[in-house]
UniProtKB/Swiss-Prot annotation:
Main location: cytoplasm
Stored SUPFAM superfamilies: Nucleotide-diphospho-sugar transferases (SSF53448), Trimeric LpxA-like enzymes (SSF51161)
Signal peptide: none
Upper taxonomic lineage: Bacteria, Pseudomonadati, Pseudomonadota, Alphaproteobacteria, Hyphomicrobiales
CC per GO annotation: cytoplasm; membrane
Chain positions recorded as acetyl-CoA binding sites: A365, N371, Y372, S390, S408, R425
Pathway where it operates: Nucleotide-sugar biosynthesis; UDP-N-acetyl-alpha-D-glucosamine biosynthesis; N-acetyl-alpha-D-glucosamine 1-phosphate from alpha-D-glucosamine 6-phosphate (route II): step 2/2; Nucleotide-sugar biosynthesis; UDP-N-acetyl-alpha-D-glucosamine biosynthesis; UDP-N-acetyl-alpha-D-glucosamine from N-acetyl-alpha-D-glucosamine 1-phosphate: step 1/1; Bacterial outer membrane biogenesis; LPS lipid A biosynthesis
Protein name: Bifunctional protein GlmU
Biological process per Gene Ontology, one example term: cell wall organization
Annotated region described as N-acetyltransferase, given as residue ranges: 253-453
Record's subunit section: Homotrimer.
TM spans (from-to): none
Cofactor: how and how many bound: Binds 1 Mg(2+) ion per subunit.
C-alpha cells in the first residue's frame, strides 16, 4: 500500500527585506510566481494533499499556488511566532493522519522533487525526522547539521556553535520530513524558551530523539536550496534557473549560439535541432518546433513556430501568433493573434494582427492590418498565394481572395475577390517643369528673408 503524504508549504512571511507591496512568493521567476515553482516540485513527489500556510496577500498566494493536479488548502497564520508555529497553523490537515509530512518553503523556487523523495524514503526506512541539508563552501550563518554514526544529533545555530561545529559545512536548508503519525505530538512539544520567544521547527530533532525516535539528514544540491529574501537574490535565482533550463534544452538537441543571452519562460518548449540566436526572449506559452530558426533580438510570447519556419531578427510574436512550416516573419515585424500559412512571408516592417495569411502569400514591407476601430477588434483574411504590395493598409474587417494582388500603397477597405488586382490609392500625375517653379519660388522667399536682416 502506498504511503500517504501531506506537504505543508510555509508562505506567510512578511517579506520585509524584499521591499515590496506584495508577498515575496508572488514575485516571478521565469514568468511564474516562485510559489508555483515550489508547488510543481511538490506535485512531482506523489503527495496526497497540500496545506499552504499564508499570511500577507493570502488570497493571491493561494491562487498562485493552485497549479492544478493537487488539492491545496490554505491556512492563515495570524501571528509570526516561528516555523514551528507556522506548521501548526495547518493542524487540521495534520490531524487527518498522513504517513508522511513534508515541510517546504514558498521561497525556494529552484527546488526539485529529488530531495523531497529522498526525505520520504528516509521516513519509510523508519526515521521520525528527516532534515534536508546541503554542503556549502560558505556556511556563514546557516545552522550546522551535527551527525554521528549516520544519525542527526542536532541542528546547531551558528551563533551557538563551537569552533569545531562551525567547521561543519553540511547545513540546514529548513526543509524536512516528519513521521505523520507522530507529527502533532512532536510539534506540540516545541517550546518557545528562547531569546525571540518563537517556536522553532528545528527543535524537532532533539525532541524526537528524547522520545526514542531517530533523526537523519539527506543531502541536496546547494543550488536547489537557495532561498529568496531580497531583489538581489531574486535576480540571482533567476540567473540560476535560466542556466539550468538552457543547459537542459541544449542537452536535448537545441542549438543556442550564446546561451547566456537567451531568456526562457517556465513553460517554454523548444524542439530538437531548433536554432536560437543571441538575445532572444521567450515569454510564457511558447512552443518552438524542431528545426525552427529564431534569429537574434526577437521577443516571443504565447506563440507557436512550426519546424522550418524562421523568425526575426528583431521580430515580435505576441499571443496567438502561429507560424506554419516554412513561413517567415522577418525584421521589425509584429504578429498578434495571426496565423501565417505554410511558406507565407512577412519579411519587413509589418504589423499582422487578428489575421490569417494563406499558404504561399507574400506581405510587402510596411503592410499593416488595421484591426482596431477604437472600440472593437476586427479580422483580416488573406487567401493563399496572394501578393500584398508594400506600404498597404488593410482595414478590417476585410477578405482578400486566393491569388489576388494588392497594389503598393493601397488602403483596402473592401473585399478583394480571388485573382483580382486591387488599387486603393490616388492615381499618379506628372506635371512637367513644375518642380523648377516650386524650387525657384522657395529660393526667392529664402533670399527675401536674408535681405530683411
Amino acid at each position: 500500500m502506498e504511503r500517504t503524504c501531506l506537504a505543508i508549504i510555509l508562505a506567510a512571511g512578511d517579506s520585509t527585506r524584499m521591499k515590496s507591496s506584495i508577498s515575496k512568493v508572488l514575485h516571478p521567476i521565469a514568468g511564474r510566481p516562485m510559489i508555483a515553482h515550489v508547488m510543481e516540485a511538490i506535485a512531482r513527489t506523489d503527495i496526497s494533499a497540500a496545506a499552504l500556510v499564508v499570511g500577507r496577500n493570502a488570497e493571491e498566494v493561494a491562487a498562485a499556488a493552485d497549479i492544478g493536479g493537487i488539492e491545496v488548502e490554505a491556512y492563515l497564520q495570524k501571528e509570526r511566532l516561528g516555523t514551528g508555529h507556522a506548521v501548526l497553523a495547518a493542524r487540521e490537515a495534520i490531524a487527518r493522519g498522513y504517513d508522511d509530512i513534508i515541510v517546504a518553503y514558498g521561497d525556494v523556487p529552484l527546488l526539485t522533487d529529488v530531495p523531497l523523495r529522498a526525505a520520504r524514503k528516509g521516513l519509510a526506512d523508519g526515521n521520525d525526522i528527516v532534515v534536508i541539508g546541503f554542503h556549502t563552501e560558505n556556511p556563514n550563518a546557516y545552522g550546522r547539521l551535527l551527525v554521528k554514526d549516520g544519525e542527526l544529533i542536532a541542528i546547531r545555530e551558528a551563533k551557538d556553535a563551537t569552533d569545531a561545529e562551525l567547521a561543519v559545512t553540511w547545513c540546514n536548508s529548513g526543509l524536512m520530513a516528519i513521521n505523520g503519525r507522530k507529527a502533532l505530538d512532536l510539534l506540540d512539544r516545541i517550546g518557545n524558551s528562547n531569546a525571540k520567544g518563537e517556536y522553532y521547527l528545528t527543535d524537532l530533532v532533539e525532541i524526537a530523539r528524547s522520545l526514542g525516535g531517530r533523526a537523519i539528514a539527506v543531502d541536496a544540491p546547494e543550488v536547489e536550496m537557495t532561498g529568496c529574501n531580497n531583489r538581489a537574490e531574486l535576480a540571482f535565482i533567476e540567473r540560476l534557473w535560466q542556466e539550468r533550463r538552457r543547459h537542459e534544452l541544449m542537452l536535448s538537441g537545441v542549438t543556442m549560439i550564446a546561451p547566456e543571452t537567451v531568456f526562457l519562460a517556465y513553460d517554454t518548449v523548444i524542439g530538437q535541432d531548433a536554432l536560437i540566436e543571441p538575445n532572444v526572449v521567450f515569454g510564457p506559452r511558447v512552443v518552438i518546433d524542431s528545426g525552427a530558426v529564431i534569429h537574434a533580438f526577437s521577443h516571443i510570447e504565447g506563440a507557436h513556430v512550426s519546424g522550418t519556419a524562421t523568425v526575426g531578427p528583431f521580430a515580435r510574436l505576441r499571443p496567438g501568433a502561429d507560424l506554419a512550416d516554412g513561413s517567415k516573419v522577418g525584421n521589425f515585424c509584429e504578429v498578434k493573434n495571426g496565423k501565417i500559412g505554410k511558406g507565407a512571408k512577412v519579411n519587413h516592417l509589418s504589423y499582422i494582427g487578428d489575421a490569417t495569411i494563406g499558404a504561399g502569400s507574400n506581405i510587402g514591407a510596411g503592410t499593416i492590418t488595421c484591426n482596431y476601430d477604437g472600440v472593437n477588434k476586427h479580422e483580416t483574411h488573406i487567401g493563399a498565394n496572394s501578393f500584398i504590395g508594400s506600404n498597404s493598409s488593410l482595414v478590417a474587417p476585410v477578405r482578400i481572395g486566393d491569388n489576388a494582388y494588392v497594389a503598393s500603397g493601397s488602403v483596402i477597405t473592401e473585399d478583394v475577390p480571388a485573382d483580382a488586382l486591387a488599387f486603393g490609392r490616388a492615381r499618379q500625375e506628372v506635371k512637367l517643369g513644375r518642380a523648377k517653379v516650386i524650387r525657384e519660388r522657395a529660393l526667392a522667399i529664402k533670399a527675401a528673408k536674408k535681405g530683411s536682416h
